A protein has these predicted regions:
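Short, exposed beta-strand/loop patches in secreted or surface proteins that constitute
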Residues: 49-55, 121-126, 163
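Short carbohydrate-recognition loop motifs
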Residues: 50-70
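Secretory/extracellular carbohydrate-interaction modules
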Residues: 64-133
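Sec-dependent bacterial lipoprotein signal peptides
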Residues: 1-20
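Bacterial Sec-dependent N-terminal signal peptides
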Residues: 17-47, 51-53
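Carbohydrate-binding surfaces in secreted/extracellular proteins
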Residues: 88, 154-194
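Short, aromatic/His-centered strand-loop micro-motif at the edge of beta-sheets
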Residues: 136-160
Length: 195
């Protein structure tokens, strides 16, 4: 059976603003501002859409009224993994911790993220206040690459993240704080275990 690949997003807290843009890598790369993207509200979102506000002005915003939010997610279907770029901006209105962080699934074997899935994701925060790339097999996450600790301090900054997977299974990710003019290449790692 062919694994269904979904670009997905999982959020483990309240009030996350996400500006989302996904495209194939271009030779003449345009480093435009992800905030200018107006396609977010037009994407075919699935999952717990009642917990999110989705519009072209704010992008995707977690709006779960529960005090103890737990896990909330929305997904969009896709067949692309290799030779693909994911690019998005995030503003967390909380200071991430070991128990309070955000996950953005780039690929997943299921559009239901509350169980066993195979896929790759970016995690913001956690035991370290960094951005990291993980592979998940079933319920077991494996850290593939860890970036700089950009989420330290009391105020969580606005952060832009770019991830690419090439045809050979090399994953590369970059980060850029709102105060920075250019992306910083964090890591590159080869992993095509579940591609």
């Amino acid at each position: 059976n062919r694994m269904r690949i979904c670009k997905t997003f999982t959020f483990l807290s309240i009030f996350i603003v996400l500006f989302y843009n996904c495209s194939l890598p271009a030779d003449d790369e345009d480093e435009g501002n992800p905030e200018e993207d107006n396609t977010t509200s037009e994407l075919p979102w699935e999952g717990e859409t009642d917990k999110f506000t989705i519009n072209s002005k704010e992008g995707l915003r977690l709006n779960d009224p529960q005090e103890n939010a737990g896990t909330a997610y929305v997904t969009i279907p896709s067949n692309s993994v290799k030779n693909t770029r994911w690019e998005f901006g995030v503003r967390l209105t909380f200071n991430p911790s070991a128990n309070n962080y955000a996950r953005f699934y780039l690929t997943s074997s299921s559009n239901v993220l509350s169980g066993n899935v195979n896929g790759y994701y970016i995690q913001i925060g956690g035991a370290k206040d960094n951005v990291a790339l993980y592979r998940q097999n079933g319920e077991q996450p494996k850290l593939l690459a860890s970036g700089r600790e950009v989420m330290k301090g009391n105020n969580s900054p606005k952060l832009y993240i770019k991830v690419e997977c090439d045809n050979n299974g090399y994953w590369t990710f970059w980060t850029r704080l709102e105060s920075e003019n250019e992306y910083t290449k964090e890591k590159q790692v080869k992993d095509n275990s579940i591609l």
